[in-house]
């Protein structure tokens, strides 16, 4: 099985411990607030209010898991914020809404090898930058494609419809071609969601993705009964393992998934 990592957003140390026991590979602390309310506040999206103290608390309970921290978009406070999250225990720093190569270079310089660096590609400009000759990926360890903001920029109604846009698809294909580890979007339990977890898993495998965020549909399972949560995480991983061993089935399910995405977007 390829190095496929499950991530989940949390700032609760007790919950984080349960996530690690359930096989979640990365704990995700989300510090991003700058500009997010303006971009996403009118949509049914989660805007976290996490803190540096949350990074410290999760670092103490992460055990074998990695701790990913999404910081705010680059500005005059970025150096202090990056230094603080690394000192608090971040293993991976995720930069949202970057504007140009200069910001990437500056974050690489600030991190200085103390943590992994994951730029978040969530604009068409970022997609174009990544596919251009101007993109210098020295110091970039992996990428994540933020379908939420991409689908808003594309004026689409269904988040996964972003994957059908040629510019987004080209950027994802480029990541696969150059061997850059990447992930995109979120994933629901196997039989849940407008686009169920099994269908989303097939898209990830076909496109070469190796990371995914467990969606908020998993959270009630954890709150109600941790055993059910563990079972659903294990079930999703089993589906991924099965699909990895059957390229034909993966291709067929991914094709059906695209048809479902198109139908959902058209019906909105």
PLM feature spans:
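Acidic (Asp/Glu)-rich catalytic clusters
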Residues: 19-23, 52-64, 83-88, 108-113, ...
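Glycine-rich phosphate-binding active-site loops on the catalytic face of alpha/beta enzymes
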Residues: 27-37, 89-103, 139-154, 203-224
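Active-site-adjacent beta->alpha loops and helix N-cap segments on the catalytic face
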Residues: 35-58, 75-79, 97-116, 126-129, ...
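C-terminal alpha-helical cap/extension of soluble enzyme domains
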Residues: 78, 176-268
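Catalytic cores of alpha/beta
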Residues: 13-22, 76-88, 103, 124-138, ...
């Amino acid at each position: 099985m390829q190095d496929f990592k499950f991530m989940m957003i949390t700032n609760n140390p007790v919950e984080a411990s349960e996530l690690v026991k359930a096989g979640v590979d990365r704990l995700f602390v989300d510090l991003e607030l700058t500009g997010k309310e303006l971009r996403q506040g009118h949509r049914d999206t989660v805007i976290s209010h996490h803190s540096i103290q949350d990074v410290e608390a999760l670092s103490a309970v992460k055990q074998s898991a990695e701790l990913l921290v999404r910081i705010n978009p680059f500005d005059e406070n970025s150096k202090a914020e990056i230094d603080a999250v690394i000192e608090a225990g971040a293993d991976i720093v995720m930069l949202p809404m970057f504007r140009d190569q200069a910001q990437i270079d500056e974050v690489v310089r600030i991190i200085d090898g103390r943590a992994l660096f994951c730029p978040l590609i969530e604009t068409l400009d970022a997609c174009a930058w990544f596919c251009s000759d101007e993109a210098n990926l020295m110091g970039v360890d992996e990428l994540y494609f933020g379908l939420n903001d991409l689908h808003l920029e594309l004026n689409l109604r269904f988040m996964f419809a972003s994957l059908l846009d040629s510019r987004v698809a080209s950027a994802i294909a480029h990541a696969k071609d150059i061997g850059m580890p990447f992930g995109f979007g979120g994933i629901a339990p196997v039989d849940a969601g407008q686009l169920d977890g099994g269908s989303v898993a097939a898209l990830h495998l076909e496109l070469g993705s190796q990371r995914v965020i467990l969606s908020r549909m998993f959270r009630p399972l954890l709150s109600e009964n941790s055993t059910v949560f563990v079972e659903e995480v294990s079930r999703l991983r089993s589906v991924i393992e099965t699909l990895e061993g059957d390229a034909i089935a993966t291709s067929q399910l991914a094709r059906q998934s695209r048809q479902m995405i198109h139908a959902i977007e058209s019906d909105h």
